[in-house]
A protein has these predicted regions:
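Single conserved hydrophobic/aromatic residue that forms the stacking wall/gate
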Residues: 1-12
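Generic extreme N-terminus detector
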Residues: 12-13, 25
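Hydrophobic alpha-helical transmembrane bundles of multi-pass membrane proteins
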Residues: 21-264
Length: 264
C-alpha cells in the first residue's frame, strides 16, 4: 500500500508540473485585460458608427417624404427618383475620389490630392460609409430647394459635382485633422452644421436663384400660394428626419462613449 501511495504521489506531482509548464507556455498568448477592453471598445465603436450611418441613410426617405408632401402631386415621382439617385451617385463618387479628396495626403494647401485613400485603399469601411451618407445629405438639401423646378438629368450632374468635388474639399478644410486650415484656425464643426448644412444650403441658394421661381408662383406682381399635395406625408418626413438627427449627432463623435457623448 505504501508503494502504491508513493507512485500516486509521484504521478500527481508530475501532472501538476506538466500543468504548470503548459500554463506558462500559453500565458503569453492570453491577451491582457486592457487589450480585451480595447478590442471590445473598438468593436462597439464600429457598430455604433454603422448604426448611426444607417440612421443618416434613412434620412433620404425623410427628405423624399417631406419634399413630395410639400410640393405638387405631379412632382412626386421625380422627387423620389432624385433622392434615390442621390445615394447611388454619392456612393460611386465618394468611393472613387470623394473620400480621397477629403482625407488623402495634403499636397496642395487647401486641397488633398494624395491618392493614398482613393478607392477606399487604407480606409476603414465603416468610416467611409458614415462619411458617405453625410455627403449624400449635403447633396439632397439642394433637392428640396429646387423640387419641381429642374430636370432630372441636370440634378444628377450637380450631384456628381457636389459629392465628388464641392463637399469633399470643404469637408477636408475642417475634418482632415492636422493641416485642416479651418480647424487649425480654431473653427469648430461637431456634426456638420457648416460642412454639411451650410455648404448644402449655399449650393441650394445658388441653384434656386439659377432656376428661378416655380411656374405660376408669381403672376402680375402677385404672389400665388402653391399648397402642398399631402401634408401628412410631409409631417411623416419631418419625423423621419428628426430620428435621423440622432445618428447625425450621436455618430459624429466617432467613438463608443467618451467625453463627447454629452455634446452629442
Amino acid at each position: 500500500a505504501s508503494l502504491v501511495g508513493s507512485e500516486m504521489c509521484i504521478r500527481d506531482r508530475y501532472n501538476a508540473k506538466n500543468f504548470i509548464m503548459n500554463y506558462l507556455d500559453i500565458l503569453p498568448l492570453i491577451p491582457a485585460e486592457e487589450d480585451i477592453v480595447a478590442a471590445v471598445n473598438n468593436d462597439f465603436t464600429i457598430l455604433w458608427i454603422l448604426l448611426s450611418g444607417i440612421l443618416v441613410f434613412f434620412m433620404q426617405a425623410g427628405f423624399t417624404a417631406l419634399e413630395a408632401g410639400m410640393t405638387r402631386a405631379k412632382n412626386g415621382v421625380n422627387i423620389a427618383m432624385k433622392n434615390f439617385m442621390d445615394i447611388c451617385v454619392a456612393t460611386i463618387t465618394w468611393v472613387v475620389c470623394g473620400y480621397g479628396l477629403m482625407y488623402g495626403a495634403k499636397t496642395a494647401g487647401f486641397i488633398s490630392l494624395g491618392s493614398d485613400v482613393w478607392f477606399n485603399e487604407g480606409a476603414g469601411a465603416h468610416d467611409v460609409f458614415f462619411q458617405l451618407v453625410f455627403a449624400a445629405t449635403a447633396a439632397t438639401i439642394v433637392s428640396g430647394a429646387i423640387a419641381g423646378r429642374t430636370k432630372y438629368s441636370t440634378y444628377i450632374i450637380f450631384t456628381i459635382f457636389m459629392t465628388a468635388i464641392i463637399y469633399p474639399i470643404s469637408g477636408g478644410w475642417q475634418w482632415y485633422g492636422d493641416g485642416a486650415f479651418l480647424a487649425d484656425a480654431g473653427f469648430i464643426d461637431f456634426a456638420g452644421s457648416s460642412i454639411v448644412h451650410a455648404v448644402g444650403g449655399f449650393a441650394a441658394l445658388v441653384a434656386a436663384a439659377m432656376v428661378g421661381p416655380r411656374i405660376g408662383k408669381f403672376d402680375g406682381g402677385k404672389v400665388n400660394p402653391i399648397p402642398g399635395s399631402n401634408l401628412l406625408l410631409g409631417a411623416l418626413g419631418v419625423f423621419i428626419l428628426w430620428l435621423g438627427w440622432f445618428g447625425f449627432n450621436g455618430g459624429s463623435q466617432l467613438a463608443w462613449g467618451g467625453a463627447d457623448s454629452a455634446a452629442a
